[in-house]
Amino acid sequence: YKDYVPSHYELGFQLVSYADRRYDEYIGASITRYTSDYPILIFTTQLALNKYYGTSTRQLFRETFSSLNELWDSLPDTGNSPRVVSPPVKIYTTYSHPLYVNDSTLLVLKEDYDRASRFVEIDLHSGQERTVCYTGPVSTRPVFRNGTVVWTEYRQSTVWEQKVDSRLCVMQYGDDRYRQEASFGDGVLYPVLTDDGDLAFVRYHYDGHYSVELHSRERGTLRTHFDESVSLHGLAWDDLTQCFYYIALSDDGMSIGGVDFSGLKGRRFPVTSPAYVTVNNLSAGDGMLYFNSIYSGKDEAHTIDLSTGRQYRISESRYGSFAPSPSPGGEFVALTTYERDGYKTALQEVEYWEEVEWTPVPRNVVNAPLKPWDVPVVDDVVFTEEELNASMEKHPAERYSKAGHLFNLHSWAPLYYSPDRLMENSTLDAQFGATLISQNLLGTTEASLGYGYTLDGHSTVRGRFAYYGWAPKIEVTALWSDHPHQTINTASSPFYTSYYKGNSFDLSVRAYLPLLLSSGYRIRSLVPTLQFNLDNTEIITPEGQSNRASLVLASVQYNEYVRKARLDLQPRWGYTLRASTVSNPFSKLFATAWSVYGRVYTPGLFLHHGLTLAAAYQRTTDVFPMINVIDFQPRGYDQIATTSYFAASADYLFPVAYPDWGVSGVFFLKRISLDLSFQYARYLEPEYFIDLTGTAGNGLQKRGVPRHIYTFGGAVSLDIAPFRMPAE
């Protein structure tokens, strides 16, 4: 949390490429083979490195960066030609896609560990910064023209969480609020505005191809479609040439092209030839194109003069410069440049440092030379139609059987715990034992089976199966224990008696339909739920019949809260509302109850502190009591039988320390936090009913006697990354 952590892909590339030079082979193959041969072992990477190469992950890391530091120290220190204009920062910060609003004001996207993604204004005269508005997850860069800002954000499908689209966002500058435009549909990328107010953008189609669309007020909608082998990664509008320009990626590499919509159909023309040189963040103005390119070995700002077709590098950076955008007069470009504490907003005077000649690949400056692999170049491999037909005959296509692929055992743990609880609320209720974990390749089913042994000598077996392939999600959980189940004898009037015998089991079947209603900075959801619970708690009726405890619960929950920053422990603002009802349709001994619950998130006294207030109220519809309260109960109480119940709580959550310390290969402790809690409950205890909490002296209370519960305390939470798992 203190500093930027590169992705495991970036780090892994450097480790593997160094090992390839050091040991003259690709170590990933040996590690993968060893892992598949010995899946029962946990630290397979460490064991394989020691077995085959006599090294360890720590030693490999140190050798890799010792070699890289020697290379980097040998490079000339170029300094930074861009002049940083963003205010100093105290934490890792990312500025991106700066835009000129006028000669003295920049509009920039900003995100840091303390705050979520947002637009900020930077005054170039005073250096002051002002937050304009918070955004959702931005998918493609913003564009400003004539007082309007357009960009796109990711948006989840209402029903399918894994289905994510990109939607147009529009903000009138000065309103400090924006809206998502659903009328243009999904798959919208890289929107731009013309001087006439027309809108154009790239659209990704579900069949895999891209198109450029112009939505003109006078001419309607014009489109030009690209082959499926071509993907588009940028769009810009040039006011001088009155054309659109795009970045295309094909089998031949990346290139820049143009589209002229002056006719009835879009006429496409090339600007640069394809090359395996990465270019990004295209913008345009006054007959010039601006973008960043890896041509020189580091990302630098480039420009193309459309009148001559010549390309120039216009920045010289120590670590790279990105996303150039021209000033109104064209003398400067606003861009971002990288430093140790993040990406800074900077200005670069447009001066030609170097004319760029076409080259098939970029210069290799910051990476050590790679050893050539003795494998054919994929572009040189010819797969004829005859070979394709022969392959199809040998391996004919078959219908994928979902039922036959529900289970895929992939992991195990030498302890008993509930993987679903660990993923949902970070609760690790570990015991001695073992757990098997399964997830199918489609991600539509999850399953686990665990055996646990408690210190008091009891065994527990828990199995869970969840299916997410339909809109309503279904979860089935079964638990068996040799711990005796409870028997309540209501036939022993006037006093109920309770005793334990045999084994115990619990079965839960839950179906719910999460409706995702998120938009921008706010996350919203509506979740109706239906759940059936059955256990072998035995209830002897006054007539002497034996009933099992079973409950049917129905609830509707609505959530709304703002997106969290990286260091936030909980949302800064938000609330949850839930209405529930529960009954036992198979026994008259249980009442039907209803409950309402609410929770509110607010900021605390300091940054990343949070206050949570919650309350619940429950009533039964007749005189029979419920065994359990539906919503939350004070800590230390898990069974309260009552006809009327009210509870409230206040929790103050805050970080205590960021150790950034651990035991290599075992765990890494990132943060320690503390939750101070106060809880209160008032309920009416029923007459002649056994006190299941065991707090009463003789175990009996009278109906209607009000009871009050006060609890307070604290809970310490450890934010841990175990076993070298990626931080993100």
Please annotate each region the language model reported.
Residues 29-147:
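Beta/coil-rich, acidic/histidine-enriched accessory regions frequently appended to metallopeptidases
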Residues 185, 317, 404-455, 476-482, ...:
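Transmembrane beta-strand segments that form the barrel wall of outer-membrane beta-barrel proteins
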Residues 92, 110-119, 134-139, 152-168, ...:
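A flexible loop/linker signature enriched in serine peptidases of the S9 family
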Residues 478, 491, 545-678, 682-702:
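C-terminal outer-membrane beta-barrel translocator/porin domains of Gram-negative envelope proteins
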Residues 303, 433-440, 459-479, 500-517, ...:
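Feature captures outer-membrane beta-barrel proteins of Gram-negative bacteria and organelles
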Residues 82-90, 128-133, 177-182, 220-226, ...:
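A short beta-strand motif characteristic of beta-propeller blades
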Residues 158-159, 299, 318-322, 340-343, ...:
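Outer-membrane beta-barrel translocator/channel fold
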Residues 91, 293, 354-471, 475, ...:
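Outer-membrane beta-barrel initiation region
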